[in-house]
UniProtKB/Swiss-Prot annotation:
Highest taxon above the source species: Eukaryota
Binding positions for ATP per the UniProt entry: 36-39, 96, 226-228, 292-299, 363-366
Signal sequence coordinates: 1-20
Protein known as: Endoplasmic reticulum chaperone BiP
Residue segments, region Substrate-binding (SBD): 399-499
The UniProt record lists the keyword Transmembrane: no
GO cellular component terms, A-Z: endoplasmic reticulum lumen
Regulation: The chaperone activity is regulated by ATP-induced allosteric coupling of the nucleotide-binding (NBD) and substrate-binding (SBD) domains. In the ADP-bound and nucleotide-free (apo) states, the two domains have little interaction. In contrast, in the ATP-bound state the two domains are tightly coupled, which results in drastically accelerated kinetics in both binding and release of polypeptide substrates. J domain-containing co-chaperones stimulate the ATPase activity and are required for efficient substrate recognition.
Length: 651
């Protein structure tokens, strides 16, 4: 690697940094989060090994779904996904497919057509619009991702019994700068300091390679999830994980395979019944739920039935689906996964026989046809089977989190990642002048001297792009800034040094200096149209805290209501029991208690949206009637037990 190509490459020897006890910042327990398109997963390095943490439903993966019920209650994870078919317009998902993108991006526009919720344009960003209680509210994808991250944080805290404030979060290797920045912003909104953003295939390689650090191997990681696809080629040598090449598609995954099935059955229904079910969001979401189940079934079976009660206008739906039909409908998408594989092989300069192991990651790699295509491409080589495709990324993130926080027993791990796209600036004629080629190891720094294009030019505009095309118009614009106050001089004479610096998270800082005057200007690329402002982040943090408070209030209201309901029915049942309390009270006393209990029950039926304080007041009223009567039974005996939220049988 010549000095002219890469200047100042700093290898990320995180082990050395983390083991340096003097001056090491204390982060507490650092968690690793795989923030997925369809499912997310959280892990922690503890007691010498990784623990993948189950949620409150006992599931080790949590749906990346957020929903708002009719009374404004917020649901996240399993609870949100479970009510998708009954509340489609207020159930948000796929934030990862929208995060860091322009509203007018063709992929975004394609997705909007199939979402049951509204997506609106706000400052050229896609905002997800739902009904929250009595008002409509738009959420940035960062906010929705933050809600999912806050759920993962909550899951970890419940398991660890302590507050968690720092995390390592994974992103697709092919995420661009704006998408990485937006993911960090989501962490901040969720109350997490994201210490490191690492690429998903790299995390998976750590999970795979943790036990195989003594041998040098070339590993190809094929990561096909719910919404994104990455291929990375790494070398592992004595605990050093070096990414050699990476490629992929940030808009390809299991959801696209589901959509092909939905389109197929929609056409089939229209042909048989003459009706278009796409006009009914609930029908489409019912179909989506069932085709996703069928897709999973077809990974182990050759055929299945799609059966839906009351799909559309009261009619049931029942159709067979074979694995062969599923493969035929998705044949082009399945085959398109091999293009990035070819790309990384070409970029790395390795032959197929040089690959020691193929690691399949992501739920979509369970599809037999995908496994077959990968195996055939590598001349019959079997992929590694001993790794859980759903948990591998979170596992690797947890190991990296352990390394950063200085946990013992993580071993001598060094992670050398790469930037996925070429970075450069626009020069005269719209030419893309490359400063940092793709697949350069990060962190890295590169400088180059430029000059003015006209005599006495007082200002130069530095326009920053990422991409592989020779002209900037075909690449992805990141941002621009001006260097002003250049003294009058003939064109070509001033020396303007432009420096690109990429940090360990793959985030770019560009600076320019007039070598004659020492005047400087710089930009941390945040693509104003694609990234939320610090003020917006602060507002979203406050909103997140407000929602957290609201969640607590809703939970308290439900608990107090349940207490009142339980008390009322329990008292009614006890006074009816002649063998127990009912046999010790007079008819008038029984009637007084029953009337009070009935009044409380009727009040609850008439006031379903009552506040917590109202329920407490009603409970106090009921207790004030019951307690004096019941107390008489205990005169001269031990005092009665207090009336609890769940009344004992002998009041």
């Amino acid at each position: 690697m010549g000095l002219s190509t890469y200047v100042g490459i700093f290898l990320l020897c995180i082990l050395t940094l983390s083991r340096c006890k003097s001056g090491k910042e204390e982060y507490g327990t650092v968690i690793g989060i795989d923030l997925g398109t369809t499912y997310s997963c959280v892990g922690v390095f503890k007691n010498g090994r990784v623990e993948i943490i189950a949620n409150d439903q006992g599931n080790r993966i949590t749906p990346s779904y957020v929903a708002f019920s009719g009374d404004g209650e917020r649901l996240i994870g399993d609870a949100a996904k479970n009510q998708l078919t009954s509340n489609p317009k207020n159930t948000l998902f796929d934030a990862k497919r929208l995060i860091g993108r322009d509203y007018h991006d063709k992929d975004v526009q394609g997705d909007i057509k199939r979402y049951p919720f509204k997506v609106i344009n706000k400052n050229n960003k896609p905002y997800m619009k739902v009904q929250v209680g009595s008002e409509e509210k738009g959420f940035a994808p960062e906010e929705v991702s933050a809600m999912v991250l806050s759920k993962m944080k909550e899951i970890a805290e419940a398991y660890l019994g302590t507050e968690v404030t720092h995390a390592v979060v994974t992103v697709p290797a092919y995420f661009n700068d704006a998408q990485r920045q937006a993911t960090k912003d989501a962490g901040a909104i969720a109350g997490l300091t994201v210490l490191r953003i690492i690429n998903e295939p790299t995390a998976a390689a750590i999970a795979y390679g943790l036990e195989k650090k003594d041998t040098e191997k070339n590993i190809l990681v094929f990561d096909l999830g719910g919404g994104t696809f990455d291929v990375s080629l790494l070398t592992i040598d004595n605990g050093v994980f070096e990414v050699v090449a990476t490629s992929g598609d940030t808009h390809l995954g299991g959801e696209d395979f589901d959509q092909r099935l939905i389109d197929y059955f929609v056409k089939l229904y229209k042909k048989k019944e003459g009706k278009d079910i796409t006009k009914d969001d609930r029908a489409v979401q019912k179909l989506r739920r069932e085709v996703e189940k069928a897709k999973r079934t077809l990974s182990t079976e050759h055929s299945t039935m799609i059966e839906i009660d009351n799909l559309f206008e009261g009619k049931d739906f029942s159709e067979p689906l074979t694995r062969a039909r599923f493969e035929e409908l998705n044949n082009d998408l399945f085959r398109s996964t091999l293009k990035p594989v070819m790309k990384v092989m070409e970029d790395s300069g390795l032959k197929k026989e040089d690959i020691d192991d193929i690691v399949l990651v992501g739920g979509s790699t369970r599809i037999p046809k995908i496994q077959q295509l990968v195996k055939e491409f590598f001349n019959g080589k079997e992929p590694i089977r001993g790794i859980n495709p759903d948990e591998a990324v979170a596992y690797g993130a947890a190991v990296q989190a352990g390394v950063i926080s200085g946990v013992e027993d993580t071993g001598d791990i060094v992670l050398l990642d790469v930037c996925p796209l070429t970075m450069g600036i626009e020069t005269v004629g719209g030419v893309m002048t490359k400063l940092i080629p793709r697949n350069t190891v990060i962190p890295t720094k590169k400088s180059q001297i430029f000059s003015t294009a006209a005599d006495n030019q007082p200002t130069v505009t530095i326009q920053v792009f990422e991409g592989e095309r020779p002209m900037t118009k075909d690449n992805h614009f990141l941002g621009k800034f001006d260097l002003t106050g250049i003294p009058p001089a003939p064109r070509g004479l001033p020396q303007i040094e432009v420096t690109f610096e990429i940090d360990v998270n793959g985030i770019l800082r560009v600076s320019a200096e007039d070598k004659g005057t020492g005047k400087k200007s710089n930009i941390v690329i945040n693509k104003e149209t694609n990234r939320i402002t610090p003020e917006e982040i602060e507002r979203m943090i406050q909103d997140a805290e407000k929602f957290s408070d609201q969640d607590k209030q809703v939970k308290e209201r439900v608990e107090v209501r349940n207490d009142l309901e339980s008390l009322a029915y329990s008292i009614k049942n006890q006074v009816k029991d002649k063998e127990k309390m009912g046999g010790k009270l007079s008819d008038d006393e029984i009637k007084t208690i029953e009337d009070a209990a009935d009044e409380a029950i009727k009040w609850m039926e008439n006031n379903p949206q009552a506040e917590t304080s109202d329920y407490k007041k009603q409970k106090a009223n009921l207790e004030s009637v019951v307690q004096p009567i019941v107390s008489k039974l205990y005169e001269g005996a031990a005092p009665p037990p207090p009336t609890e939220s769940t009344p004992k049988e002998e009041l």
